[in-house]
Amino acid sequence: MASTWFTNIEALSYSVVEFIPYVGTVYSFKRAQLAYQERDWPRHWQSVANFLESAIRDVILFAGVEEVAGVVILHTIAESFTDKLVELYYEHNKDEADRVRQPRIEIPQPQALDPSNELVVVAGRTKGAHGEKVFHGKAKGVHRFHGARFAGTIKHSKYAPSGEYIQLHIPQGLFDGARVTFMWKWTKDEWGTENRPEVIVGTISLYIGDDKLTWFKFTKRQGAGWRPGEGSDFNCKVASLNLIIASTTVGDESLKIDLERI
């Protein structure tokens, strides 16, 4: 049965409300409860993670924590919660993705941009239709990609020789300043720890590549899990509405990842 609470309007509203002190914290907690009741695990864990981060933010804002040591302790608590949530969120989303994987859409030839309009070309289409034109701004980027999730396989000769499942979450849509999340695990990390999770959260900017397709890159990012700090950087090509090709560098090895919409 379709959810009567989690609509597109609610999701768009939440992307704004979650950043409001106290209000966003309370609503994230309530949203996590509702998602749990509906067994909507992706929304549940997203809301739990947002609630914990918002709670730390509110403590700093309202309690007036100014001492460096106090702030460091609070952020350490938040990171320890986040690392565990990464593992749980990863497993739940992997199970769901295996159930609802959708077929891949063919990629037509890129089309030339209209220089009189601020447009980019996205190559996704249905049979017999022309390539989609998408505005380089919020409206169309939100409409086409709001709440989209993509998944694929990340391979590294040392840390994931057989390949590991990786997810890309686009909760707000694709536009300048939108937030996206990459989440995966390594078969083993540099110290031999097995099944080591990693997550990169950040804001993006869009640009047009030499191939006349839409690309996006991080303007700001934060890593958690194996490599905290900024973590891995990603550069992504929107090859179609159902395919994003991501590239990153780990150590001295360049990786290319095909991510399909799920």
UniProtKB/Swiss-Prot annotation:
Disruption phenotype: Does not affect the production of iso-A82775C. Induction: Expression is co-regulated with the other genes from the iso-A82775C biosynthesis cluster and probably controlled by the cluster-specific transcription factors iacI and iacK. It comes from the Eukaryota. Iso-A82775C is a precursor for the biosynthesis of the anticancer natural products chloropestolides A to E via a Diesls-Alder reaction with maldoxin. In the absence of the prenyltransferase iacE, siccayne accumulates instead of iso-A82775C and can also be condensed with maldoxin to produce chloropestolides H to K, which show also antibacterial and anticancer properties. Part of the gene cluster that mediates the biosynthesis of iso-A82775C, a enylepoxycyclohexane and biosynthetic precursor of the chloropestolide anticancer natural products. Within the cluster, the prenyltransferase iacE prenylates siccayne to generate pestalodiol E, using dimethylallyl diphosphate (DMAPP) as cosubstrate. The probable oxidoreductase iacF is then involved in the epoxidation of pestalodiol F to pestalodiol F, which is further converted to pestalofone A by the short-chain dehydrogenase/reductase iacG. This is Iso-A82775C biosynthesis cluster protein B. It comes from Pestalotiopsis fici (strain W106-1 / CGMCC3.15140).
